[in-house]
Amino acid sequence: MINKKSKIKVKKMNHSVKIILRMGVYQLLYLDRVADYGVIDEAVKMMKKIDRRSSGFVNAILRNISREKDSILDLDDSYKNLAIKYSYEDWIVDRISDQYGKERTSNILAALSIRPRIFLRINRNKLRDGENLSDLKKYIVDRLEKDGVIVRDRHILEEAIEVENFKQIENKDLFKSGYISVQDISSMMVARALNPKKNSKVLDLCAAPGGKSCHIGEMMKDSGSVLACDVFDHKIKLIKAYSNRLGLTNIEACINNAMVLNEDYVGAFDYVVCDVPCSGMGIVRRKPEIKYKKKEDVDSLPKIQRKILDNAAKYIKKDGVLIYSTCTIFKEENIELIEEFLKDNKEFKLESIENLPFERERLDKGYLEIIPDRDDMDGFFICRMKKI
């Protein structure tokens, strides 16, 4: 949008000019609590405090956009205009259009622009003798509501609670004492798809900050072992702090490079989880900066993902289960990569996913594509494979 109205392209603008213009344009087009003149005036004042010389430029661009606001908002949803309307790099919109069709692309981008909901995960490890999860959930909901939190239980997963008006969670007693954790509903699906048996040996190769590992530990009722790995020491500390807060004793965090084969892990685990580094194109509403990723950076990811998956395959016992997951909707990081992996590794086969609230025909394929426009949650890909 800014590029259309400015002779100086965004990439060449001073960083502060770019940020102020983006904020101003968003307010002009999509917010209505402040009149246009007020938005422009505040943007110019802000710019003067940083760089007085650029204030006239900011004023001119924003006034130009304000004058043409109605025609801009009336842009049709042809894919050529979607990059402007939703503020994406052109190549991202083109790729979504190629993979999901031009008509659906607008719906996907709109869904990725909706304010994300907040979900809490209940710690099953807090169940007392004779108590079921419904009892624990009621106890937590009652305490949340007494604290002024709005609770919306949509019954997607029994251990999940949707909340509003929940601020400074780290200071809440329920959080500090390990009853709840913040985790998006799509992310919770990974441990659910794994569905580990009690006393199993589990490896989480890309575990930080620890949400999925701890969810797995909770599902096994603090039995067995979950080895949660990451390549950075500061992330290992995050995992340890997470599991300690929840009171889990079956989580062990250690440094390990998922890109390098670890001979000590070969054939040692009942379950392995690969929640690999990805483009994040399913969680744009949580991390809007993803809209501006460079094509070459995203195109380099499948090679990294495949290397991690190949190593993970070697760590599983016979009849063990391998979970591959991402938080992207790009097919080259998801099903296309899995198809290539299965072609090269005949000892693995897709296995029907249980324990998830989706139509049977979607789960029987052995992989689940969660797309924001259809499923009303963050975009995710989860694949379950068995070693035969």
Spans of model-derived segments:
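S-adenosylmethionine
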Residues: M1-I388
